[in-house]
From Swiss-Prot:
It is an enzyme of class 3 (hydrolase). It catalyses: alpha,alpha-trehalose + H2O = alpha-D-glucose + beta-D-glucose. The keyword Transport does not apply. Changing H525E: 15% of wild-type activity. One of its GO terms (biological process) is trehalose catabolic process. Its EC number is 3.2.1.28. It comes from Sulfolobus acidocaldarius (strain ATCC 33909 / DSM 639 / JCM 8929 / NBRC 15157 / NCIMB 11770). Catalyzes the hydrolysis of alpha,alpha-trehalose into two molecules of D-glucose. PANTHER family: GLUCAN 1,4-ALPHA-GLUCOSIDASE, TREHALASE. Belongs to the glycosyl hydrolase 15 family. This is Trehalase 1. Optimum temperature is 60 degrees Celsius. Keywords: Carbohydrate metabolism, Glycosidase, Hydrolase. Optimum pH is 4.0. More than half of the maximal activity is observed over a range between pH 3.3 and 4.0.
Amino acid sequence: MLGMKPLGFIGNGLTSALVDNGSIVWLTFPRFDSPSVFGKLLDDNAGEFSIRPVEDKFKVSQSYLVPNVLSTTFKSSNGKAEIVDLMPIGEKAIIRKVRTEIPLSFKIIPMFNYGLYRPIIRRKDDGIQFLNPVSRECLSLLSDVPTDEIKPPGTTLYLVYSSDCAYGPLDKGKQLENDLENSFNLTIDYWKDKIRSNDEVWRTSVGVLLGLIYSPSGSSIAAATTSLPEAVGDSRNWDYRFVWVRDSSMISEALLYSGYVVEARRILNFMLALVNFTAKPLLHPLYAVDGSDPPPEIEIPWLSGYMNSRPVRVGNAAASQIQLDIEGFLVDAIYKYYKYTSDRVFVEENWDKIKYIGDWVSKNWMLKDAGMWEDRGDPKHYTHSKVMMWVALDRIEKIMNVKIHEKDEIKEWVMRNCVKDGSFVRSSDSNDVDANLLTLPLYDFIDVKDPIFLKTLKRIEDELYVDGFVKRYSQDFMGEAKHPFALATIWLARVYIRLGRKERAMELLDKVLKPSGTLYLIGEHIDVENMEYTGNYPQAFVHAQLLLALKEVKGLST
């Protein structure tokens, strides 16, 4: 099984893959939340597509030519080789262009349904078909390599998914080869034109956010993977291949301020389309990429898990929770979009939905919920959730130029029930602090220099700060929180920026990036001892907050 090291990420708005030094170890077809066809990331026997030198001694490195176009380079005493991996725009496919001076071995072992089914293999003159034995779907590999060895000067491998094996590409002959070369070059041009910057960190973060957008609907998933553990060997393994309202709101904001107004608006449109008038405006905290209800959470018993971290889960039971902060995140993102673009038509088209959110929050703000961290224990009056309900009403006041009295009631309740010994606490029945309290000044609930917040900040620094990183909390319903959280650490950096401590903020951002190596892809948690990421990867809302922090550290407002 793989060690905890940075993996290359590529995506194309339909699905995504992770590449480990020439081996595709995670790939789902036909979309992000589909079962894997290459799943070595979660089990050695769950399928992979690997290319590596025949000889044993070589050096390997990975880098991005442009975002979502990954180069893997092998160097040995006998020469060098390069694999360029990308997912062509608009296709459920992957192209691997190989240029080499040395012999390379390649191995392709797809396994359908998370490693459960071995394919039926059909060899044809111009490639191989891999058929799912329990359905009509198949993978087709177009290749002019007749064996499992790639000889100099190299070749181009094209792997494409078909929902029905009757419509595979193996009968298109030479015409497809010309189209394939064109698709490869145009995909590179697409990302080069789409993301223009000399800042590699910024460029990679934008590439991750755009690569994780499901282009048919405009929705944005939280991460490319499922069940990468928060701590190796632990059971905190969740499926993040869904559209969280909270995460998507952050992503919309980050894309907006990075110049991607259309993509930001599409994310907002996707979420607004889910608002209903019958009950809670957003019934679920998360949705499938097409807007349907997320599937039930189940465990996959035949997979050993990442480094034997069981169970492997697909689906996410948090979908059934009540989370009261999400409407606040959405309305805040809508307000920022409106303020940035002056797009009054957008607001007017969604006026009834925005107003309903305000009405519902005004009537239901005293409910308990599972909180931002999706605690699976008893619901509580979480401070952060109450604050985000205040945010919802505050932003609606600004958008609609009205006064909502319940906003003041929420703030009074929070200050009366969620402040203890001069500090904000995690919930009304707790004396502990929580890293999400760092967001209170970020969302203008309280001034960053207010004595109550400064005491809260001091407690977070004393109680949750670990070797330059910030834990979310000390413990939850599953016990102790083992590793710091990348998102919380960036929040702390954003607070320091507001306090004028920019050098300290930059130190924190540099530390968050340190485990990413040269790829600048960031995970969810940081294993401080090994200086490696844990949890699902790459993590979209971390990259979103990083983009906001980088903008703020340069003195630009968000």
